[in-house]
């Protein structure tokens, strides 16, 4: 079966720090995705499962309210019944299940758009560069690692290429560099430390290892580092970063 867009998933690394002090990077975390949609407006969140058996899990949420303050909440699943959050979220930063679902878990805004679906066997989703802040007197550069994985059970993606979406969100402040090797567990001491063994950081399209001409076989994955550049005393912004994956398959 040919590779489809739903087979190509962006996953987190094992260490996605909540500050500038903890380890960043590491091996792939195939339970946490880094793709989801922001609420179209601030709203309470609704969660439910496609399976009535999902009644023991909790979903731990971190996000921001309309004032920009970080808020947290733990929501208990009730099978296929809608459960509504107490808090109103302007955006979600992290959503993580206490245990994987028997069914797919949907996270939506109350009266607004669907935010994400957590597939069976996975734990949640997150936004890289959690609570990143600028320095009052100097610029700052942060590095966090994510992966692109081909979840197709049998087919290969040839000419696998990462393509940032220009002129949207934080495209002017984030570049990326592909690791010199697949499935690398490389980490750095904190997210202010630059990784080694990475192609030059840039904002253009780039193929996966080796030398930008590689392939992603079934269940294969490639790590790449995001580099975010912040100016001194830069104002807070509610934004996003988009990157696409392309290739050919048969």
Across the structure, where does each feature detected by a protein language model lie?
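Beta-strand-rich interaction surfaces with strong enrichment in secreted/lumenal proteins
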Residues: 131-134, 198, 210-216
């Amino acid at each position: 079966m040919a590779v489809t867009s739903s087979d190509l998933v962006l996953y987190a690394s094992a260490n996605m720090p909540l500050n500038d002090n903890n380890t960043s990077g590491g091996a792939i975390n195939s339970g946490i995705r880094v793709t989801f949609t922001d609420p179209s407006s601030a709203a309470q969140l609704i969660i439910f499962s496609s399976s009535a058996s999902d009644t023991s899990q909790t979903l731990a949420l971190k996000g921001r309210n309309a004032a920009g303050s970080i808020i947290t909440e733990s929501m208990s699943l009730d099978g296929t019944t809608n459960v509504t959050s107490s808090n109103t979220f302007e955006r979600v930063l992290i959503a993580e299940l206490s245990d994987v679902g028997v069914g797919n878990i949907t996270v939506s805004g109350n009266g607004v758009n669907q935010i994400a679906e957590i597939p069976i066997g996975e734990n949640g989703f997150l936004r890289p560069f959690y609570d990143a802040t600028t320095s009052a007197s100097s610029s700052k550069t942060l590095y966090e690692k994510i992966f692109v994985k081909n979840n197709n059970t049998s087919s290969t993606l040839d000419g696998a290429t990462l393509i940032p979406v220009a002129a949207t969100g934080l495209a002017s402040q984030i570049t990326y560099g592909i690791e010199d090797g697949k499935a690398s567990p490389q980490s750095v001491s904190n997210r202010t430390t630059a990784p080694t063994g990475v192609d030059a950081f840039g904002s253009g399209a780039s193929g996966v290892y080796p030398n930008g001409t590689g392939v992603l076989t079934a269940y294969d994955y490639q790590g790449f580092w995001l580099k975010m550049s912040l100016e001194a005393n830069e104002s807070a912004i509610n934004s996003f970063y988009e990157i696409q994956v392309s290739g050919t398959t048969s």
